[in-house]
Amino acid sequence: MFLKFHRSPGLPDVLAVCDAELLNTTLKKGDVNVQISESFYGNLRVTEEEVKEALRKAENINLMGERAVALAIAAGLASRADCIMIGTVPHVQIYRL
């Protein structure tokens, strides 16, 4: 998986995680194209344990892919019903308020 924290002064960090095979691909659903880019998901390849640790700390989370989403579900942060499918790929966004 690839992971990147987006940091902006005065705003909560955003954690972006995608499954490795999705990086630099484009997903399609109807008229919508979603680019899974290195600029958003980063180029830092991480283990499941590193993703789990990041999920514990993050306030805003963007996950793309079966493995990334499954970690959030296993951690109790999301459910399958919270996901949308982009083609055959699950995607979920989590916001802690």
List where the protein language model places each region.
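Conserved mixed alpha/beta catalytic, RNA-binding, or beta-rich assembly cores of soluble enzyme
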Residues: M1-E49
